[in-house]
Regions:
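Amphipathic alpha-helical segments of tetratricopeptide repeats
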Residues: 64-71, 106-113, 146-156
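"A position-specific structural signal for the A-helix of alpha-solenoid helical repeats
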Residues: 40, 87, 126, 163-170
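Residue register of alpha-helical TPR repeats
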Residues: 36-37, 81-83, 122, 162
Length: 176
């Protein structure tokens, strides 16, 4: 029985990934598009309450792809890397992967060091969430306290409210 050959005919396939990208858009535009598009699609899946196994895998892959595309952008900042690692940590926490969540949360804190209290507070939120997944009550309490310390220093009411809500949801998980 012959097998199915799913390869493109040579006449249809680009000779390189660069040729494929440059045929329609340039690389910078592609990275710009996919860094945001993949982040937003991952975020949609984070918010979804009943994800399938496939959607969980897609959520992780989209976040990883987004972060990689950010690293390829000439305008990538430490804030972008902080946000990307925060999202990745959140996803690993949702998937119950404590060690991966912690690694990404530590990267988030690293990239947040010289940014605003909002980003540092969220890095500690990610560290607290990963500690919760690891059942590390001491680490969770420490990073919740740190996040609250930075929360008090956030000047924007809207940003402060967003972090406050995430901290309360995390604190509520212990009470549930």
């Amino acid at each position: 029985m012959p097998y199915l050959d799913f390869r493109f005919p040579a006449s249809l396939a680009p000779s390189s990934p660069t040729e494929m990208v440059s045929a329609t858009v340039n690389e910078a535009e592609a990275h710009r598009f996919f860094s945001a598009h993949c982040f937003n699609r991952a975020w949609d899946l984070i918010r979804k309450s009943n994800r399938t196994t496939i959607e969980c895998e897609q959520m992780l892959q989209l976040s990883q792809a987004s972060l990689w595309h950010w690293t390829q952008r000439s305008d990538c900042t430490t804030k972008n890397l902080s946000i990307g690692n925060w999202q990745l940590s959140r996803i690993y926490a949702l998937l119950g992967q404590a060690e991966n969540a912690l690694r990404s949360a530590r990267m988030c804190l690293h990239y947040s060091e010289n940014t605003s209290p909002f980003f540092i507070g969220y890095a500690h939120e990610a560290l607290a969430r990963s500690a919760a997944v690891a059942e590390d009550d001491v680490g969770k309490a420490h990073h919740l306290a740190e996040a609250r310390r930075y929360l008090a220093r956030i000047p924007d009411d809207g940003n402060r409210a967003v972090l406050q809500a995430d901290l309360e949801s995390l604190e509520g998980e212990a009470a549930a």
